Amino acid sequence: MKVSEFDYELPSELIAQEPVEPRDASRLMVLHRKTQRIEHRIFREIIEYLEPGDLLVLNVSKVIPARLYARKKTGASIEILLIERLEEGIWKCLVRPGQKVKKGTELVIDEDLSAVCLGRGEDGTRILKFQPQDDRLIFEKGRTPLPPYIKNEVPLERYQTVYAKEEGSVAAPTAGLHFTPELIEKLKKKGVQFAEVVLHVGIGTFRPVKVEEVEKHKMHEEFYQVTKETIKKLRETRERGNRIVAVGTTTVRTLETIARLPEQEEYVGKTDLFIYPPFEFKLVDALITNFHLPRSTLLMLVAAFAGKDFVMEAYREAVKRRYRFFSFGDAMLIL
């Protein structure tokens, strides 16, 4: 399958530069897979589509302030993006410009914080040891790691879901940005159940698909965790005959990863599961997601879930109706 089949025309003014206030006032496109019908609603009206006993599964990973600005002793500016914590104060990072950072290169963030390059990781990353080795201090100095298509500085809390609690992502699981505490409360009152997973969104989010053939693309590994409590809720939902509703593509990848493993009480590991058409979904019955970049692995996942032709038609409709796209954009519910 060609990557070009997942391309579409998007006017740049439809790329949302800041989030909507309140969060649940964003638009919601509803896709009905059985009837191929499309509806246009507001996100807070999602409550009308969820039944008592349905299980909403949230990714509670929290975005870290992963972007840092440093200087070499020569005065050259270096941008650092924290990718993965190896141990306290030692991180796998992306650095720009990369050719200027070699083993032994010292980087100064400010008078309180510096780093030294211990060497190269795979895939062009660098291993940086910070001085002092204090993650709290590193986070204090860091900024929100916004995607390159967002030009405004946005406070970290607005690039964070209201339920985020497990630090580790370098990009937000954006489908969850539309939920407010009030909406969650209303859903609970209706009898909708909630469960949590963790998938720390990694650098794959920033990396474009560079191959021509979809099947040749390789995903980066990302850390995930599913607790006993969540496993129990998934099982009970299945037994009741209710739906498992994934909030976001990261939740889908976590659930479909464990669905392919031997049964365990709880799961923790790394996944590089790449979902593209055709794909047999074993756990996810419905999906809440944003509008994704052309040719992206996220769009391929959505196409696998709802059918490529239907999804590409929905995207053309979204452009025509001037929906807002990407991280701070509008949402889609696929039933």
From Swiss-Prot:
InterPro entries referenced in this protein's UniProt entry, alphabetically: QueA, QueA_dom1, QueA_dom2, QueA_sf
Family to which the UniProt record says this protein belongs: Belongs to the QueA family.
Descriptive protein name: S-adenosylmethionine:tRNA ribosyltransferase-isomerase
Annotated localization: Cytoplasm
Any Pfam family hit: Queuosine_synth
Broad class of where this protein is predominantly found: cytoplasm
Pathway terms, separated by semicolons: tRNA modification; tRNA-queuosine biosynthesis
Plastid keyword on record: no
Alphabetically ordered keywords of this record: Cytoplasm, Queuosine biosynthesis, S-adenosyl-L-methionine, Transferase
Subunit structure as annotated in this protein's UniProt entry: Monomer.
Organism: Thermotoga petrophila (strain ATCC BAA-488 / DSM 13995 / JCM 10881 / RKU-1)
